[in-house]
């Protein structure tokens, strides 16, 4: 996998499963990403608001606040609405993708994670020009 084109892009990984979290964080760091971790949706919203990552990888089945609600919160906040969010979920039905997009996710990927597919989505979202809100 090629390194990111931006220098040290910051990823917020919101994942409660320790094994998934450690594997993804390790692989992201290995190729040059700075990784911040949150273990539930509420913590993810707080960290995204404080740290302003370049992208959020959001598990949808989270304790305290699920990924759907966390994404809606991020997209409703003018300070975080431009941060791309990729939904990570074990649910692979077409209706699940539609639910993710309706919540405000910019992309959707299923578990188990296909590393190349996920990184293609991450790279595309990080390297797209910012959208104007006007």
Question: Model-derived features: where do they sit?
Answer:
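Conserved acidic carboxylate
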Residues: 15
């Amino acid at each position: 996998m090629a390194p990111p084109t931006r220098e040290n892009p910051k990823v917020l990984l919101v994942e409660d499963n320790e094994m998934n979290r450690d594997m993804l964080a390790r692989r992201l760091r290995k190729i040059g990403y700075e990784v911040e971790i949150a273990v539930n949706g509420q913590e993810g919203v707080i960290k995204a608001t404080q740290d302003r990552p370049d992208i959020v990888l959001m598990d949808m089945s989270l304790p305290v606040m699920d990924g759907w609600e966390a994404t809606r919160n991020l997209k409703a906040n003018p300070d975080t609405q431009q941060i791309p969010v990729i939904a990570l979920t074990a649910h692979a039905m077409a209706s699940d993708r539609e639910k993710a997009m309706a919540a405000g996710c910019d992309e959707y990927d299923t578990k188990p994670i296909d590393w190349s597919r996920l990184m293609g989505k991450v790279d595309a979202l990080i390297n797209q020009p910012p959208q104007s809100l006007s």
